[in-house]
UniProtKB/Swiss-Prot annotation:
List of residues binding S-adenosyl-L-methionine: N84, T86, R90, E130, D157, N212, L213, R230, N231
InterPro entries: Bact_Chemotaxis_MeTrfase, Chemotaxis_MeTrfase_CheR, CheR_C, CheR_MeTrfase, CheR_N, CheR_N_sf, SAM-dependent_MTases_sf
UniProt domain CheR-type methyltransferase: residue ranges: 7-283
Name listed for the protein in its UniProt record: Chemotaxis protein methyltransferase
Length: 283
């Protein structure tokens, strides 16, 4: 029997040295700062993975990760330890700003140019509630203002499991609690067991793609009119946040916006002008 376990504890215990090594792996590959205070959470979330893979302890698992040449194992790791708590119309002030400020400006710009496409990136999209909310807002805006333009919403995440959930677009009732009833009826189909599925009219507006925000460059040939990266950078240290903000800046069009989580800040970036809490504009 593994000495790191007892009959009352189904989790595999992680030592201080093992925890330190695992924290380093997560930071180097994903930019996420795991705290040593997360020890119990890590044990509870990873123990089942270790058992399925046949590892007797965390040292064996970490040795395997360090020697691994592929990224499938790393994706499995981040899938297990990531917290994916989100819902439709989360931090609604951003969507008010989108409807009242950003979309009118984009409409004016489109009407005065040959380019009729709006490009929006939901970075760290988790299970899809954010990009689908954006799609709803755009559909409603175009219908209300009797305008029509091409819309491309790119939604990316490092986690394969949440991307699969996002593509399926099925959510329990607590995820749509902030959704007005008329939007619920218009854009969701009610399923059994109090679950709801996003209709195809929204699904076809959103393209989901796996992407690591720590990649040196992003595989995009065109810039964006708006980037959402909300409640993602809270896991990063200041250096990583600043590096990511600089990368976002390089993929934004002039006079476009970056929206981050309301508990997050970007400091010392001369290219991004602070507009209001969690809202920045590229000069």
């Amino acid at each position: 029997m593994n000495t790191n376990q007892n009959k009352f504890n189904l989790n595999i215990n992680i030592t201080k040295d093992e925890l330190s090594r695992l924290i380093k792996i997560v930071y180097n590959n994903f930019g996420i700062n795991l705290s040593e205070k997360k020890k119990l959470l890590i044990e509870s979330r990873l123990s089942s993975l270790l058992k399925v893979k046949g590892f007797k302890n965390f040292t064996e698992y970490i040795n395997f990760l360090e020697k691994s040449t592929g990224n499938i194992q790393l994706i499995e790791l981040i899938d297990k330890i990531s917290t994916n708590h989100t819902y439709f119309f989360r931090e609604s002030k951003h969507f008010d700003f989108l409807n009242n400020k950003i979309l009118p400006k984009l409409t004016e710009k489109i009407l005065n140019s040959e380019n009729s496409e709006i490009r929006i990136w939901s970075a760290g999209c988790s299970s899809g509630e954010e990009p689908y909310t954006i799609a709803m807002m755009l559909k409603e805006y175009m219908e209300h203002n009797r305008v029509n333009f091409k819309v491309k919403i790119l939604a990316t995440d490092i986690s394969i499991s949440v991307l699969n959930e996002a593509r399926e677009g099925i959510y329990p009732e607590d995820r749509i609690i902030n959704l007005p009833k008329y939007l619920k009826i218009k854009y969701l189909n009610q399923l059994q067991d109090d679950k709801f599925q996003v209709k195809e009219i929204l699904k076809k507006m959103v393209y989901f793609k796996k992407l690591n925000l720590m990649d040196e460059k992003f595989p995009f040939s065109k810039k964006f009119d708006l980037i959402f990266c909300r409640n993602v950078m809270i896991y990063f240290d200041e250096k990583t946040r600043n590096n990511l903000a600089n990368k976002f800046n390089s993929y934004l069009k002039k006079d476009s916006y970056l929206l981050i989580g309301h508990s997050e800040t970007i400091r010392g970036n001369k290219n991004l002008e602070y507009i209001m809490p969690a809202t920045y504009k590229k000069n």
